[in-house]
Curated annotation (Swiss-Prot):
Record key words, sorted: Calcium, Cell outer membrane, Membrane, Repeat, Secreted, Toxin, Virulence
Functional summary from the UniProt entry: May participate in the pathogenesis of meningococcal disease.
Membrane topology recorded in Swiss-Prot or TrEMBL: Peripheral membrane protein
Alphabetized GO MF terms: calcium ion binding; metal ion binding; toxin activity
The keyword Calcium is annotated on this UniProt entry: yes
Keyword Secreted part of the UniProt annotation: yes
Primary location: membrane
Locations listed in the record: Cell outer membrane; Secreted
Hemolysin-type calcium-binding repeats: 869-886, 887-904, 1015-1032, 1033-1050, 1051-1068, 1069-1086, 1087-1104, 1215-1232, 1233-1250, 1251-1268, 1269-1286, 1287-1304, 1415-1432, 1433-1450, 1451-1468, 1469-1486, 1487-1504, 1615-1632, 1633-1650, 1651-1668, 1669-1686, 1687-1704
PANTHER family (UniProt xref): S-LAYER PROTEIN
GO cellular component, one term: extracellular region
Protein's UniProt name: Iron-regulated protein FrpC
Length: 1829
């Protein structure tokens, strides 16, 4: 590579490809330019955005754009330039890649650009002509003139150099050289310097460059100077003259006619106003305010600034002219001087004009105290409020289209026109009021029309001689009346009447020739002026040829050339003449005559005329009905009142149409009439369809709809100028569609008229409350009176105030009336609280509500605010285009202004708002405005990232301006000014200063690009540097400090700080506290200071500095770069002998011997200290330096303590010595001696020897063939990979061989060792080797689970080989061979046989997968089956036998055994003893044998077998599977009659009648015997079988003893019979009879009947409505839930009703009963005395009880009756009366009155049958009622 040559790396090329993929050519070229590519520097300027460029770069870009425009045209440039640029850039990157990183040469660049240009559709010749394909490399080479496009064809070689045979490029370069010499040898240098200064001045002026400015200066003749002008001066000084000239033009235009310019500018901007100006008044006032402010700015600042700059520019131009000129460039000098003088004069003139206009404006506005006065001042400046017509134009479009289609005809205007400029007859479209209006059809109304362009003319004849072309009669076309009284078919037919000699030519020979004129409508207004009417002679026209052809050529813009002929000029040439069909727009119309109005009439509300209707005010002057209606409408005070009158107003205006009265019958017709100016709008097929459907009839519904629409059709005809006398339809659907379009259009019309009259009528009184102020030359509006006016109305009519304010805001666009929107929000909130909001919204209508709730603006100047009409309190507002005002209001809002000069308004309680203000346009001015008295001192200004945060100090709100500080506040997101309610304004510079001020809190401070000093002060601060050299002081607090691109100094100060360097050579000082320092790029210095710090140098040569008391610090020094030199430097007298150096993992630990600190250098020893984390040198304060090699030696030295020693890759011997040490091998063959202590030794990748020595050691092999010797102690050895030898030594050791063929060595006294030998590899051979004379007969071999136990018979040791028998000894855990010291070897098969031999002790024997017979013999043995069919005999002892997966036979033998089947169909025989049998899965057979056994079948169809003497056995048969069949089989002659079948709970009990045994089937009766526990069948030895149903019947049979009988769910009758029985009901309605005996009867869930019968019985109801009858005896009855009936019967009974409405029944001889009637529900309980009258019963209080006594033998005690209502009986029923709770409640509450009044019942008289005396009866009478039947 040559010196200075740029060569890119693959990574840099990949970065360039990223720019290409994103389409960012500017960024890509800038990236290349920064790498040193000169060509890229110029290319970036060519493709960059104007906003990215300035001075010379912008000049070059404009020059290149000129070249494109000159060569292929501006349109092609705009379409293809960016695509060509992107492809060229991509190809340029490909060339770099192809050249292995070298930059392309000039020829490669030219070919690349040529390919890019032609690829995108530019012709090859044009691509060659585009000097741009050579200009880019020329710029790179320094040939600036070629780069700006001196095209070859414009340079005469002989005038430059005498080299006609030279190449084009050489000649051009020589020309430049000659020019350079010709201009004093310094032309290029001076030119560059001068041009840059000029461009800077123009930039200061804020002007933009134009392309053709210099073309206004005339040519200089021929020769090199002319070429120089065209190619150089034009290109380089492009636009200077035009800039100056345009400014003059704009200034004059803005200030001409003084205040009248205000009106013109507003109209030019598209503002439309009415005579009264009360319509859209806000547009007027806002425009006036803006223009006035512009005037003031131009006079006080703008003009002075501009003149000063242009004067300086003029002087520079003069000086430059002198410097640049000598004899050959005199012309250039003169041009420059002329330009300078012109600029000076232009700006002096502009200044003078502006000052005069400003003064006039001041005087004008000072005299305007109110809006009303302003309106009067401007009344005569505006002819009509025409805007409403354009606003409503679209609403009429469907109607016009439909009527044209349905009346079958379209109308056009038909004049004759001449091509005057030779480029064909050109026309323009209709443009409403801004275009041509002409009275074609002679009705006195000028309507909008397509028109002939200004460079062509209409053939006309002034018939009445008034010098004006009045109407279509004076054109030649379909409105020309012929001699016979008819109208001409077209223009040629009209002209033919003037051919007096019949030669088919109109010339001087024809009498009328001299009367013909050509109207060239120069101003395109449709009104002929004298200078626009020219004779044929003046235009050199000799004759007009009447011959023509029908061409029907579409001219665009809705116009058609119908016929075309020609005319002849006096020079003999011909030109085109044609008959046009011009588009007609009847909507935009103006009456030609004017109605004079009285002063009173002139005050009426007004709308511009439309269609065939005059202006509303004029029409009212001619119609009394309309005038009265307009007056009434204007006087209506509410929206409802105006809407009620609106239809009538619309009709009365329509009735002033001269055509009114012609109804619009909708009828079917096939008779078509076509005149010269009408065409048929239907196709032939449609006409045929019409004829086919000629008899289409309409339904009554359709006819009714048509009748209702007739009147509206007439109205719309008047407003649109249409004629819908006959409308055609082809179906009922067509007819109904006409009705729909009619109604929709009418509704739109009504809405439009309503809205446009709003501010002239109902809302006008409010507007009159607005006043004007002039303060300090500032024009403002005062709305205070307007707020008062609305609040005054609200006091008496809240709905009117609400609706009026809403419509003023929706349609008035009061941009600066912020109070109005807040007032609306208040009204909304009040309406919502009052429940009126929905009603008010209905009055307003959907459109108005939508406008007030809208969140997105348009291209116009919009006002957006959430005033409560939206669904959400938090809204997002989008201004889009235009100068918008966005007011978030309450809530947390998102405001995005879009393009234009936008204003964001915030008042009190503005919430948590966000402003997104992206707008890259120049000249825009975006503002945040605080109102409601908010001033700057009430807010704080802070920065977060690039966002500006403006917070209210009282926490009432915050505004976040996103990306405000992009480009240091000069970017596209900035807010240009922040305005406060006291008039104070903050510009960007002031805001930037504010956000750098610190507080005592947690601040975020940001430096700018120029470099700053930031002080965090108190608090936990964030400080951010930028591109300059910054000083960032965190001061107190836990600070975060971020460097920028400069060489920054970061001081953390006090606290736990985080310091981050960046690209420069930074100095980071953490100060006090535990700090984090990160230098990142650059050669940084990091000083942690006091505290425990983390230091990260990043890339570059970094220095870490540690002084006294440096703390517990960590250094992370990752840097893979070559050539860097990182240093740790100890200061404050610290020397190496004051420190210790140790290693932990890859970390280096440098500790102070006095314990005052430690530095941990992370990963220092990666790659043995040669990796990316190393510290290259450690420096001490005495000058001593340690390099990496020295440090490596230091850290391998052991001590008497616990050391960590590491080998290096070359192989080492490490001795741990005393202490619990950690030794680590590396890649070499290491010898690692732990020596004394509990050591941990780790092998590396070599073949290492690890010796634990004394102590409990852990030895870990690694990849090599290692030798591990644990030595004394309980050691852990892990060989890992490789063929390792493991010697546990003395102690209880754990040996793990790992992968490879490993050998485990055991000698005398080997202890209790464990071998874990997992290795799934094939081909490995693992061995246990016994030494020291140990032979096989000295050991025993047993199995426990899958483990192999090898025990010394003398108990001196045991080796457990874990999982040896996995997969029957063929698994990954096996030991392949066991070697003994006598040479004997045991393989796996031999070992497997040894461990199946039983002893007289307790053995564990395991079957193998192939099937085995195991005999336990004596002892309590464990036998385990496997996958085969095994025979497992427990023999004597209490054995545990486990089946495997096969069909196994398990025999317990003697003893209490446990037998467990598994997956197969197993046979389990318990034998003698109390055994537990579990069949688990499969169809098993279970035989308990003698003893009391527990049998559990598990899943499958199981059989339980019982023979003689089977004992007390239990069957647990849970199995929920369907299809299973479980059986109990009795053998040995046992039959059913030898057994009893009873039920206990859900269990089935099968008992031998001789008492020899019992089988309990647990839960048999779950779900009435259909559950998962059932036995499906019981088989007997005589062949009899009992199914479940039979068993269920057997267990319900009673005996003479004490039975337990259970009902089933379906409902049963159970009879207990003799004995003390237990009867249980179920869910059905059961009858439960206890019969004789003391029975216990329990109801179920049904409505049960319980009869105790004889004896002392206990009856318990449950959930249903039960009947409980105790019968004879002393019974206990409890009804529990339900409405129960309790009958105690004979005896002394205890009755407890429970919950529900219960009835207690007592008959004669019921005995001494007790009722406990406690309840918490509201049910009613009754006590019924059958056979008793009320007088027979005594009521006696006994404590808290009530006793009802019929005799000494018969009485009832109601327990706790007087405790309260919960204990009472509600009603007492007797044979002759009933006493209810309401009757006696009042006596109870009165104390003892009840008992006193009833005490007679307790008298002896009553008891002996005496009568009740009269007094007692009188008290008792109210309590007695006749019982209900």
């Amino acid at each position: 590579m040559n010196e200075g040559e740029v060569v890119l790396t693959p990574e840099q090329i990949q970065t360039l490809r990223g720019y290409a993929s994103r389409g960012d050519t500017y960024g890509g070229w800038r990236y290349l330019a920064n790498l040193g590519d000169r060509y890229a520097d110029n290319a970036a300027a060519i493709v960059g955005k104007d906003t990215n460029l300035n001075g010379l770069n912008l000049w070059m870009k404009k020059g290149v754009e000129n070249l494109w425009d000159d060569t292929v045209g501006k349109k092609t440039r705009l379409e293809k330039f960016d695509r060509v640029a992107l492809q060229h850039f991509s190809q340029y990157v490909d060339l770099i890649n192809k050249n292995n990183g070298r930059l392309p040469n000039t020829s490669e660049i030219e070919r690349s650009y040529y390919k890019a240009v032609t690829y995108h559709g530019v012709s090859s010749s044009a691509a060659i002509d585009l000097v741009i394909n050579r200009s880019l490399p020329d710029m790179a080479d320094g040939y600036w003139a070629l780069g700006l496009g001196i095209e070859a064809e414009r340079i005469h070689n002989e005038q430059a150099v005498n080299n006609p045979n030279g190449s084009e490029r050489d000649n051009r370069k020589q020309l430049i050289s000659a020019l350079d010499k010709g201009f004093d040898g310094s032309f290029k240098e001076k030119h560059f310097t001068f041009l840059q200064s000029v461009m800077m001045d123009l930039t200061k002026l804020g002007v933009e460059y134009t392309i053709d400015g210099w073309q206004k200066i005339g040519g200089w003749g021929n020769g090199i100077i002319n070429d120089l002008y065209k190619s150089v001066v034009k290109r380089e000084w492009t636009g200077i003259f035009e800039i100056v000239n345009n400014n003059i033009k704009q200034g004059n235009e803005a200030f001409k006619n003084e205040i009248n310019s205000l009106v013109h500018d507003m109209k030019a901007a598209g503002k439309e106003f009415g005579d009264d100006l009360n319509t859209q008044w806000n547009n007027l006032t806002q425009a006036a305010e803006i223009i006035y402010n512009d005037i003031v700015d131009n006079t006080s600042q703008g003009i002075e600034k501009g003149v000063k700059a242009i004067k300086e520019l003029s002087e520079k131009m003069k000086n430059a002219a002198s410097d640049l000129a000598d004899g050959s460039a005199e012309k250039a000098k003169q041009v420059v001087e002329d330009l300078a003088q012109a600029a000076k004069e232009a700006y002096e003139n502009a200044k003078s004009t502006a000052e005069k206009a400003a003064q006039a404006a001041r005087e004008f506005f000072k005299g305007l105290p109110s809006f009303k006065d302003l309106a009067e001042k401007f009344r005569d400046l505006f002819p009509n409020p025409e805007g409403w017509i354009d606003d409503g134009h679209q609403c009429f479009a469907p109607w016009v289209k439909e009527t044209k289609k349905r009346n079958g005809k379209y109308h056009v205007y038909d004049p004759l026109a001449l091509d005057l400029d030779g480029d064909g007859i050109e026309t323009v479209a209709t443009k409403g009021f801004s275009g041509s209006l002409f009275d074609h059809n002679r009705d006195g109304i000028r309507t909008a029309t397509g028109w002939v362009a200004a460079d062509d003319g209409l053939l006309v004849r002034d018939l009445n001689g008034n010098g004006i072309i009045d109407n279509g009669a004076e054109l030649f076309g379909d409105n020309t009346k012929l001699a016979d009284g008819s109208f001409a078919k077209h223009g040629y037919a009209a002209l033919a009447e003037l051919d007096s000699n019949g030669d088919n030519i109109i010339n001087a020979a024809d009498a009328a020739f001299q009367t013909l004129r050509v109207w060239q409508d120069l101003n395109q207004d449709g009104i002929s002026q004298a200078n626009e009417l020219r004779t044929l002679e003046e235009l050199g026209i000799q004759s007009l040829d009447l011959a023509y052809k029908d061409v029907n050529k579409n001219l665009g813009n809705g116009n058609t050339l119908a016929q075309q002929g020609s005319y002849t000029k006096t020079d003999g040439t011909t030109a085109k003449m044609g008959d046009l069909l011009l588009a007609a727009d009847n909507l935009h119309s103006r009456f030609k005559d004017k109605v004079e109005l009285t002063a009173e009439q002139a005050k009426a509300a007004n709308l511009a005329g439309i269609g065939r209707l005059r202006d509303l005010r004029e029409a009212a002057a001619l119609s009394g009905d309309l005038a009265n209606m307009l007056k009434a409408y204007s006087a209506a005070e509410t929206k409802e009142a105006q809407l009620a009158l609106l239809d009538n107003l619309i009709h009365k205006w329509a009735e002033t149409d001269s055509n009114w009265g012609k109804k619009s019958p909708m009828r079917l017709s096939t008779d078509w009439t076509q005149t010269a100016n009408e065409g048929i709008a239907l196709t032939p097929s449609q006409v045929a369809q019409l004829k086919k459907n000629a008899l289409v009839s309409l339904s009554d519904k359709a006819k009714a709809a048509i009748d209702a629409a007739r009147d509206r059709i007439a109205v719309l005809d008047a407003y649109t100028g249409q004629d819908s006398s006959t409308l055609y339809y082809m179906s009922e659907e067509d007819a109904l569609n006409i009705v729909k379009v009619t109604n929709d259009t009418y509704d739109h019309l009504a809405k439009n008229i309503y809205q446009n009259l709003l501010f002239q009528t109902r809302l006008q009184p409010y507007l009159n409350q607005i006043s004007f102020k002039m303060e300090n030359d500032t024009f403002t509006l005062d709305f205070s009176g307007l707020v008062q006016a609305f609040n005054h109305v609200k006091e008496t009519n809240p709905q009117k105030a609400f609706v009026d304010l809403a419509e003023m805001l929706a349609y008035g666009e009061l941009r600066s009336w912020y109070e109005g929107r807040r007032l609306m929000a208040d009204y909304v909130e009040e309406a919502k609280k009052a429940g009126k909001f929905e009603d008010y919204q209905k009055v307003l209508g959907q459109e108005t509500v939508a406008l007030l709730a809208k969140t997105s603006g348009t291209q116009a100047d919009d006002i957006l605010q959430n005033v409560g009409f939206g669904h959400n309190k938090n809204v997002s507002l989008y201004g889009n285009d235009g100068n918008d005002t966005l007011i978030g209001g309450a809530g947390n809002d998102y405001l995005e202004g879009g393009s234009g000069s936008d204003t964001y308004v915030f008042g009190k309680g503005f919430g948590q708002d966000t402003v997104y203000n992206y707008d890259y346009a120049t000249g825009r001015k975006d503002i945040i405005r605080f109102t409601d008295g908010i001033t700057a001192d009430m807010l704080t200004f802070t920065r977060e990232g690039n966002h500006l945060l403006i917070k209210a100090k009282d926490d009432s709100g915050q505004v976040t301006v996103q990306s405000y500080f992009q480009n240091d506040g000069s970017g596209a997101y900035r807010i240009d000014e922040i305005h406060f309610d006291n008039g104070k304004v903050l510009d960007v510079a002031t805001v930037k200063e504010l956000v750098q001020q610190s507080t005592d809190g947690s601040d975020r401070l940001y430096a700018y690009q120029s470099g700053n000093t930031l002080n965090g002060g108190l608090g936990d601060d964030y400080l951010y540097g930028a591109d300059g050299d910054d000083l960032l002081n965190g001061d107190a607090g836990n600070d975060s400090i971020y460097s920028g691109n400069g060489n920054d100094t970061l001081n953390g100060g006090e606290g736990n700080d985080a310091l981050y360097g960046y690209n420069g050579n930074d100095a980071l000082n953490g100060g006090e506290g535990n700090d984090h320092l990160n230098g990142e790029d650059g050669n940084d210095t990091l000083i942690g200071g006091a505290g425990n710090d983390y230091l990260e140098g990043g890339s570059g040569s970094d220095t870490y500095v540690f002084g006294k008391g440096f703390g517990q610090d960590t250094v992370y020094n990752y840097d893979y770069a070559t050539g860097r030199k990182d240093i740790i430097r100890f200061t404050d007298g610290i020397t190496a002998d004051m420190l210790t150096f140790t290693r932990e993992g890859n970390h280096l630990l440098i500790k102070a011997k006095d314990g005052s600190g430690q530095v941990t250098v992370q990963s220092y020893f990666q790659n043995d200290g040669s990796g990316a984390y190393r510290i290259d040198e450690i420096h001490f304060d005495n000058g001593k330096v340690l390099d990496v090699a020295t440090v490596k030696e230091l850290v391998q030295q052991s001590t008497d303590g616990s050391d960590r020693l590491y080998a290096y890759q070359s192989g080492n011997t490490l001795n741990g010595g005393l202490g619990d040490d950690y030794l680590y091998g590396a890649d070499g063959d290491d010898l690692l001696n732990g020596d004394a202590g509990n050591d941990s030794i780790y092998s590396g990748n070599g073949n290492d020897t690890l010796d634990g020595g004394e102590g409990n050691d852990a030895l870990y092999g690694y990849n090599g063939n290692d030798a591990l010797n644990g030595g004394e102690g309980n050691d852990h050895l892990n060989g890992e990979d490789g063929n390792d030898t493991l010697i546990g030594g003395a102690g209880n050791d754990y040996l793990e061989g790992g992968s490879g063929s490993d050998t485990y060595v055991f000698g005398k006294g080997f202890g209790q060792d464990t071998v874990y030998n997992y290795d799934y590899a094939t081909g490995r051979k693992d061995i246990i080797r016994f030494t020291d004379g140990i032979t096989a007969d000295m050991l025993t071999f047993t199995r426990e689970g899958n483990h192999l136990l090898i025990k010394a018979k003398d108990d001196s040791g045991q080796v457990t080989v874990q999982s040896y028998f996995q997969n029957d000894g063929s698994g990954a855990y096996r030991i392949d061979e066991i070697h003994f010291d006598n040479g004997k070897v045991l393989d796996v098969a031999t070992v497997k046989e040894l461990v199946q031999q039983s002893t007289d002790g307790s053995d564990r024997l395991y079957a193998y997968q192939s099937g085995s017979t195991l005999n336990g013999g004596l002892g309590d043995d464990y036998l385990y089956g496997a996958d085969g069919d095994d025979l497992l005999n427990g023999d004597a002892g209490n054995d545990s036998i486990y089946s495997g997966n096969g069909n196994d036979t398990l025999d317990g033998g003697e003893g209490n055994d446990a037998l467990y089947g598994y997956n197969g169909n197993d046979a389990l025989n318990g034998g003698e003893g109390n055994d537990h049998l579990n069949g688990e899965d499969g169809n098993d057979t279970l035989i308990g044998g003698a003893g009391n056994d527990y049998l559990e079948g598990g899943s499958g169809s199981d059989t339980y077998v019982f023979g003689k003497g089977f004992g007390q056995d239990t069957v647990y048969n849970y199995d929920y599977a369907t299809g299973r069949k479980d059986i109990i089989r009795f053998t040995d002659g046992i039959t059913a009659d030898m057994l009893t079948f009873t039920r206990e709970g859900n269990h089935l009990l099968i008992k031998a009648k001789d008492g020899s045994g019992q089988v309990t089937v647990q839960s048999y009766f779950q779900n009435d015997g259909s559950g998962a526990y059932r036995i499906d069948e019981i088989h007997f030895d005589n062949g009899k079988v009992l199914d479940v149903a039979t068993v269920k019947k057997l267990v319900q049979q009673s005996t003479d003893g004490s039975d337990r009988l259970y009902a089933y769910q379906s409902g049963n009758t159970l009879n207990g019979g003799l004995g003390d029985d237990y009867l249980y009901g179920a869910d059905g309605d059961d009858l439960l009879n206890g019969d004789a005996g003391n029975d216990s009867i329990y109801s179920g869930n049904g409505n049960d009947t319980l009869n105790g019968g004889e004896g002392n019985d206990a009856l318990y109801g449950y959930n249903g409505n039960d009947v409980l009858n105790g019968g004879e005896g002393n019974d206990h009855l409890n009804g529990e839930d339900g409405n129960d009936t309790l009958i105690g019967g004979a005896g002394n009974d205890y009755l407890e009703g429970g919950s529900g409405s219960d009835t207690y029944v007592f008959g004669k001889g019921f005995g001494q009963d007790t009722v406990y009637n406690y309840h918490v529900d509201k049910n009613s309980d009754t006590m019924h005395f059958k056979g008793f009258k009320a007088a027979d019963v005594h009521f006696i209080r006994s404590g808290s009880d009530l006793v009802l006594s019929a005799s000494e033998q018969d009485n009832v005690r109601i327990s706790g009756f007087f405790y309260g209502e919960n204990h009472r009986v509600d009603t007492f029923v007797f044979d002759d009366a009933a006493i209810s709770n309401p009757d006696f409640a009042k006596y109870i509450n009165a104390g003892n009155n009840l008992v006193q009044s009833m005490s007679v019942f307790g008298s002896n008289t009553a008891a002996t049958g005496g009568n009740v005396d009269a007094n007692t009866q009188s008290v008792q009478q109210p309590l007695l009622v006749t019982p209900s039947a």
